Amino acid sequence: MKVTLIAILTCAAVLVLHTTAAEELEESQLMEVGMPDTELAAVDEERLFECSVSCEIEKEGNKDCKKKKCKGGWKCKFNICVKV
């Protein structure tokens, strides 16, 4: 009986710690209002460039354009990366 109680309490403690860590991570990833988004713009431009160059290279090789999968919630569409 003691072992079961200890196991339940341990699981509850782990769940609480995991939830707290997830909330802290989410809060750290949120942007503050009024914060300049120059870093985001640079990432957007980089993905746009990578995606369009990848498709152009494949087109010049007389192959169908197999669109490169963009990462981080982006998708290659019409030779540009678009947010999904």
From Swiss-Prot:
A Gene Ontology cellular-component term: host cell postsynaptic membrane
Compartments where found: Secreted
Residue stretch(es) of the prosequence: 23-47
SS bond list: 51-65, 55-76, 70-81
Molecular-function annotations in GO: toxin activity
Function statement: Postsynaptic neurotoxin.
Signal peptide per UniProt: 1-22
Similarity field: Belongs to the neurotoxin 12 (Hwtx-2) family. 02 (Hwtx-2) subfamily.
Key words of the record: Disulfide bond, Neurotoxin, Postsynaptic neurotoxin, Secreted, Signal, Toxin
Tissues/organs with expression: Expressed by the venom gland.
Name under which the protein is recorded: U4-theraphotoxin-Hhn1ac
Annotated source species: Cyriopagopus hainanus
